[in-house]
Every structure is written in structure tokens, then in C-alpha cells.
């Protein structure tokens, strides 16, 4: 399960890196960042972080929580992929 959580974190970091890639310099030499995409991806990162923390912190150590946690992490991964896809298609 740690691999799934790590994979979700890597996806968020890759999306954030792509979002923070600077556009080419403008006529005045200034470099501007695509703010809309950055805000969208940052929002996705916040959502997946709180989702994953909820998966790991909400169980209280019960056996049922250990069984449910993999499904929770998969749900978080699915949510972040949907969110990131929404960011790329909304621009």
C-alpha cells in the first residue's frame, strides 16, 4: 500500500512540476507562470494530501481499518488523477 501512496504522491509532484514550467519570455523579457494551471494542480495536491492522511490516520489500528485502507488509498489515487485530468482539459 505504501507503493500506491507513493505513486499518488509522484503523480501530484509530476503534475505540479508540469504546471510550474514557465512560459517563454514575453516581449518585455519577463517570464510568467501559467497561474490557472498552477492553482488547479495545487488544489489537487491539497485534496490528495488530505485524502491520504485520512486513510492513514482514520483507522485507529482496528483490523477493519487495515482492510479498508488499501481501498481508501486507491480512491485517493483515482480522485487525484481525475482532478489533474480536469486541470489539463479546463485550460
Curated annotation (Swiss-Prot):
Sorted UniProt keywords: Developmental protein, Signal
Lineage: superkingdom: Eukaryota
Keyword Signal among record annotations: yes
Signal peptide interval: 1-21
Record carries keyword Signal: yes
Role this protein plays: Required for tapetum and pollen development.
Protein name: Anther-specific protein RTS
Native species: Oryza sativa subsp. japonica
Gene: RTS
